[in-house]
């Protein structure tokens, strides 16, 4: 078994789009590790609203002020990605009890695939506990105000997606 570098944490997700909840989690994790790698997954099965490269750029823009945070897009098995960046800890956010069952199942599978890597769960600050990318996308799609949930650049990207869809109709 490989010994993983516990000083490198990997925070994987689709980040479609990155939200203030994601940013909060990374901001609180950054002081705990030498390096936090935010892995932006391609996730074609989820049918992302934003292309991978745009999600990577938006995440870099939102997290660039952290000197020890690196944002990387990936389209491989998470276990392979974690090993490729020499991660030793997987970071996952738990917003509510409803997240726990899925996250527990994923942590168990990851323990099987990459036993040298530990999963660490962090809970969001209370003001972010109800934010999810899927809710943000849906509210934005329907013309609602999501400015309190995402950075300005993400708000603009979602506005452009909505306008492009409206132009196609």
Curated annotation (Swiss-Prot):
Q: Which organism is it from?
A: Stenotrophomonas maltophilia (strain K279a)
Cofactor(s) in the UniProt record: Mg(2+)
User: What is the disulfide pattern of this chain?
Assistant: none
Against Gene3D superfamilies, the record matches this protein to:
HUPs
Gene name, per UniProt, is coaD
The catalytic activity of this protein is classed by the Enzyme Commission as 2.7.7.3
Q: Per the record, what are the reactions this protein catalyses?
A: (R)-4'-phosphopantetheine + ATP + H(+) = 3'-dephospho-CoA + diphosphate
Q: Which GO terms describe its biological process?
A: coenzyme A biosynthetic process
Is Repeat found in the keyword set? Answer: no
Q: Which UniProt keywords apply?
A: ATP-binding, Coenzyme A biosynthesis, Cytoplasm, Magnesium, Nucleotide-binding, Nucleotidyltransferase, Transferase
Instruction: Summarize where ATP binds, as residue positions.
Output: 14-15, 22, 93-95, 103, 128-134
Localization (cell): Cytoplasm
Can you say what this protein is called?
Phosphopantetheine adenylyltransferase
